[in-house]
A protein has these predicted regions:
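Phosphate- and other anionic-substrate recognition elements at nucleic-acid/protein interfaces
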Residues: 1-167
């Protein structure tokens, strides 16, 4: 099973593709989509959408795992994150990829074993789990952590037992 993990952001969106065959997990690709504040926000959202469609059309993942939205103190940041997240979700729907959502707590527990783990702890554990020496940034390691979380849950079932959006 090929899983695309995504950590959406309005400036940097991380992604990671993991393949699980029996009990072996292989990292296929990872990286990030970077935007600059110099271009209008709607163009940044469009860039995220186009890049995600390109990644999904190239690799054809079966599932996409994405972090569920969380409460932020800065409402403007929350709105921008929501737009970036929507671009990723719409790309997945357009490409026919099943969507699964996980809370930050679920992701941290799946990777580190502790729900209040720091970005540094997640980054280090992802490198150990996947045997990758140089993951470029926290956005990418968070995306890979989200994919790891999904692979752990999908061994049993998703947290709700269903893909996101299906009742």
């Amino acid at each position: 099973m090929l899983v695309l993990g995504v950590d959406p952001g309005s400036r940097v969106t991380g992604y990671g593709l993991l393949e699980k065959d029996n009990n072996k997990v292989t990292c296929i690709d990872y990286g990030h989509i970077r935007s600059t504040a110099k271009i209008p926000f709607y163009e940044r959202v469009h860039k995220i959408f186009l890049a995600m469609v390109e990644i999904m059309n190239h690799y054809h993942p079966h599932d996409m795992a994405i972090e569920d939205i969380f409460y932020a103190k800065n409402i403007q940041s929350s709105f921008k994150l929501g737009h970036a997240r929507a671009a990723v979700l719409i790309a997945a729907v357009q490409c026919g990829v099943q969507i699964f959502e996980y809370t930050p707590l679920q992701i941290k527990k799946a990777v580190v074993g502790y729900g209040r783990a720091s970005k540094e702890q997640i980054h280090s554990m992802v490198q150990v789990i996947l045997n990758i020496k140089n993951i470029p940034d926290f956005d990418t390691s968070d995306a890979l952590a989200t994919a790891i979380c999904h692979l752990n849950w999908s061994t049993f079932e998703s947290p709700t037992g269903k893909p996101s959006g299906k009742k």
